[in-house]
């Protein structure tokens, strides 16, 4: 009795890389304290990923990016933008716009 494809041939299946590139393990435990805090937060919340836990996830990913364990990525693309982040971005763009308008020569 043979198993597999007809004719008894073995089929080679090539593994596919992750969609966003490699995600190396944190062997040195550089970000371990943050991920343990995140997991405790999830446990306290009964598995609900509320804003407090999401902020911990953001700091974990930021730590991974800082230690070159993950390619730098905009948090907006990762779905980790919060109200205070939006306010800071709006204030920064408003001050940049005001500064550029003050530099314009008046006619």
UniProtKB/Swiss-Prot annotation:
Required for the assembly of mitochondrial cytochrome c oxidase. It comes from the Eukaryota. A motif (Cx9C motif 2) lies at residues 53-63. The keyword Disulfide bond applies. It is found in: Cytoplasm; Mitochondrion intermembrane space. PROSITE patterns: CHCH. Keywords: Cytoplasm, Disulfide bond, Mitochondrion. This is Cytochrome c oxidase assembly protein COX19. Its main location: cytoplasm. GO terms for biological process: mitochondrial cytochrome c oxidase assembly. Belongs to the COX19 family. Residues 28-71 form the CHCH domain. A motif (Cx9C motif 1) lies at residues 31-41. Disulfide bonds join 31-63, 41-53. InterPro entries: COX19.
């Amino acid at each position: 009795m043979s198993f597999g494809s007809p004719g008894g041939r073995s089929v080679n299946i090539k593994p596919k890389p992750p969609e966003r590139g490699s995600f190396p393990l944190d062997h040195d435990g550089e970000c371990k304290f943050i991920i343990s805090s995140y997991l405790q937060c999830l446990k306290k919340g009964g598995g609900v990923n509320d804003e407090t836990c999401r902020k911990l996830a953001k700091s974990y990913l930021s730590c991974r990016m800082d230690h070159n364990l993950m390619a730098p990525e905009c948090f907006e693309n990762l779905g980790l933008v919060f109200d205070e982040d939006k306010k800071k971005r709006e204030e920064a763009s408003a001050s940049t716009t005001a500064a550029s308008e003050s530099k314009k020569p008046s006619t």
